[in-house]
Design a protein with these regions (language model features):
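Bacterial N-terminal signal peptides
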Residues: 1-6
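Lipid interaction determinants
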Residues: 9-125
């Protein structure tokens, strides 16, 4: 019997949710990226991201029996968006985006551990 893991996103790390997008002060111009996003392109994983216009975010991910939730701050620095979860959430995170790369119509995800997989796509109304 061969078993395959279809969700290789696990990379247990609570190092203040390492971000590879250097933190900068939240700029009003970043508000253009504020909105509600859904993760696409990762099998058997559901995730939502809400980037608020005030520089705060809410994030949720479910895979198998693991549910992850975080709130915190976000910023845009050049072509990347960084997320920093509040400490009460970060200490429990096993899966978390370390970087979101801004593309034309979506945010490509790099997870803790450096794996790129999936993209957050803005919800349509």
């Amino acid at each position: 019997i061969t078993l395959f893991c279809t969700t290789p996103l696990y990379a247990k790390s609570n190092d203040e949710n390492q971000t590879s997008c250097q933190k900068v002060k939240f700029q009003d111009t970043a508000q253009a990226w504020a909105g509600h996003y859904y993760l696409q392109g990762v099998m058997e994983v559901g995730s939502e991201l809400l980037l608020e216009t005030n520089g705060k975010f809410k994030w949720y991910l479910a895979v198998g029996s693991l549910d992850q939730y975080a709130e915190g701050t976000w910023w845009k620095n050049g072509n990347c968006i960084g997320l920093k979860a509040l400490p009460k959430y970060s200490k429990h995170l096993e899966i978390f985006p370390s970087r979101l790369d801004v593309e034309e119509s979506h945010l490509t995800v790099t997870w803790i551990g450096g794996r790129q997989d999936g993209a957050y796509v803005r919800a349509t109304q």
